[in-house]
Amino acid sequence: TFNAQYAWDKIDRINKKRYNKRKRLVNIGYIISGVAATLLLVLGFSKMGVFDKQPEMLVRMTADYGSRSEVVLPDGSVVKLNSGSDITYSYNAKEKIREVNFQGEGFFDVSKNKIPFVIKMNNGLRLKVHGTSFNLQAYTDEKTVEASLVEGCIELDHGNEKLLMNAGDMAVFDKQTNRMRPVSGVLSHSYSWLEDKLYMDHMPLASVCKYLERRYDVTIHLQKDLG
């Protein structure tokens, strides 16, 4: 005998199987299209240089009170930091950034390069070099900034005022007047701290005590009539 219900159920199962197969094919098509679109986006961004841009990393190196340190910058320049100093720079794996923020005292041995090496200080003073060695004293709590050039040529820059220095020159920038001027003195005395020596050429007693506080991480109290 012919079973009509059984026949309809069989036809229904066949139709469902065909529909599901077609649906899977459509879904696979969507997935392939999505992958292709993603690849196109990646290629597009790559051509635009989006993935070529490396994130910059801010690096800060310090020499605490009672210590000293040596820093080798990404461009090969070497900075010896005196006690109570710090230097901050941006690091990028693909770009040689020759710009630093500095406070304290340091002896810079800057590698030669067409790109200028720029030192920024918090009072707006800038020092620009291409390849040279010099001592820079720029403590935040001091009234002056002192630069002593051993080799090469450097330029001090503050607003519209500039001072070009040659080997053997020494200069002072007054933070209160925002003026800079050449000074005379014994050049080697400015970086004698590298050998743990201190020359107190006309140095006030308060400045001597401040130097000793940084160097040995101690606190010195002066009587008012001695300061």
Where are these regions (language model features)?
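A residue-level detector for the "anchor" residue at the start of short, highly conserved motifs
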Residues: 7, 11, 15-227
